[in-house]
């Protein structure tokens, strides 16, 4: 059991921790990439993720997305309805990374007309009650493009691949995992009918150093310099993969980072906050909520915080 208690301002809703005490020792023995992958998946399962060991192709992924969206929206698609939903909105052939990011952050609800004429809002995400979103993990997903690739570990939210994790064995430079992400971006992530265009975050790790960064098409944001370590509220870095998993990959934390602490801005750039920015935002929002009961004041304060933090990107 990990002691990761007392978030800042002593609120259980905060995700930047003031205190984090792991009860394991950092391994100093040799760990292959496969060892890291198996340990990561087991740790995620222990934290409540559903592991889908046989989901490794596009057909299986689409079937799972259908199941998860039906559960989230309390609806059932007929085969023709589902095909129409996918082809005309969820995975339009003309969509690229920018359009998919907009569907996650701005246009996450779609007014769908069923064959019997009824209209219902279909949500990709529940942004109000984030723990209603189903979190799953898969490994070794195979996808063709200009080259065929097989991805290490992918985190699905309501069936959609939103986080891609690439691992290298301990001792290998983490930049190799970073370079691999960019090779996949060129070769297969963004290929035709690829749901990996929905990716929002990348995580790279060699076991001893773990970093995250946003999926963006902006070349100046595509640098290794924009990768970030997770951290505690005093800016102590959380670098080892096991510690990163126990903190950043807690479902409540990851969903908050994806939904509340990532910004798709007016220049169509996807930005994700650094830990100190999130900590500052959480403090301000907590003070606003403590002082006012008006929901609109909370929303206004949150918008102000996002704007204020642009200077730090």
Curated annotation (Swiss-Prot):
Disruption phenotype: Manifests the latent anticodon nuclease (prrC, ACNase).
Pfam families noted in UniProt: HSDR_N
Membrane-traversing stretches: none
Domain of life of the native organism: Bacteria
GO molecular function: ATP binding; DNA binding; type I site-specific deoxyribonuclease activity
Keywords: ATP-binding, DNA-binding, Endonuclease, Hydrolase, Nuclease, Nucleotide-binding, Restriction system
Enzyme Commission number(s) of this protein: 3.1.21.3
GO terms for biological process, alphabetical: DNA restriction-modification system
Catalyzed reactions: Endonucleolytic cleavage of DNA to give random double-stranded fragments with terminal 5'-phosphates, ATP is simultaneously hydrolyzed
Protein family according to the UniProt entry: Belongs to the HsdR family.
Description of how the protein assembles with itself and partners: The type I restriction/modification system is composed of three polypeptides R, M and S; the restriction enzyme has stoichiometry R(2)M(2)S(1) while the methyltransferase is M(2)S(1).
Physiological role: The subtype C restriction (R) subunit of a type I restriction enzyme that recognizes 5'-CCAN(7)RTGC-3' and cleaves a random distance away. The R subunit is required for both endonuclease and ATPase activities but not for modification. Cleaves only non-methylated DNA, hemi-methylated and fully methylated DNA are not substrates. After locating a non-methylated recognition site, the enzyme complex serves as a molecular motor that translocates DNA in an ATP-dependent manner until a collision occurs that triggers cleavage.
Name of the protein this chain belongs to: Type I restriction enzyme EcoprrI endonuclease subunit
Species annotation: Escherichia coli
């Amino acid at each position: 059991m990990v002691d990761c208690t007392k978030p800042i301002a002593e609120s259980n809703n905060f995700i930047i921790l003031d205190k984090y005490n792991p009860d394991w020792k950092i391994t100093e023995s040799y760990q292959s990439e496969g060892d890291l992958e198996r340990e990561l998946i087991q740790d995620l399962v222990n934290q409540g993720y559903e592991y889908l060991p046989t989901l490794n192709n596009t057909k299986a992924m689409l079937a799972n997305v259908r199941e998860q969206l039906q559960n989230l929206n309390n609806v059932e698609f007929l085969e023709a309805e589902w095909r129409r939903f996918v082809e005309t909105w969820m995975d339009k052939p003309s969509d690229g990374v920018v359009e998919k990011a907009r569907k996650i952050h701005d246009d996450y609800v779609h007014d769908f007309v069923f064959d019997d004429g009824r209209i219902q809002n279909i949500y990709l995400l529940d942004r109000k009650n984030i723990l209603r979103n189903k979190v799953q993990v898969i490994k070794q997903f195979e996808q063709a493009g200009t080259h065929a690739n097989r991805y290490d570990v992918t985190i699905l939210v309501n069936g959609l691949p939103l986080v891609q994790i690439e691992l290298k064995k301990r001792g290998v430079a983490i930049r190799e995992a970073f370079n691999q992400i960019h090779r996949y971006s060129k070769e297969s992530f963004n290929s035709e009918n690829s749901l990996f265009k929905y990716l929002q975050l990348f995580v790279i790790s060699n076991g001893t150093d773990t970093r995250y960064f946003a999926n963006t098409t902006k070349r100046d944001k595509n640098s290794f310099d924009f990768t970030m370590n997770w951290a505690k509220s005093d800016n102590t870095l959380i670098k080892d993969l096991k510690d990163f998993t126990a903190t950043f990959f807690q479902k409540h934390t990851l969903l908050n980072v994806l939904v509340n602490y990532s910004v798709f801005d007016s220049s169509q750039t996807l930005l994700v906050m650094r830990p100190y920015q999130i900590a500052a935002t959480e403090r301000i929002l907590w003070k606003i909520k403590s002082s006012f009961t008006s929901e609109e004041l909370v929303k206004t304060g949150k918008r102000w915080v996002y704007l204020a933090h642009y200077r730090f990107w």
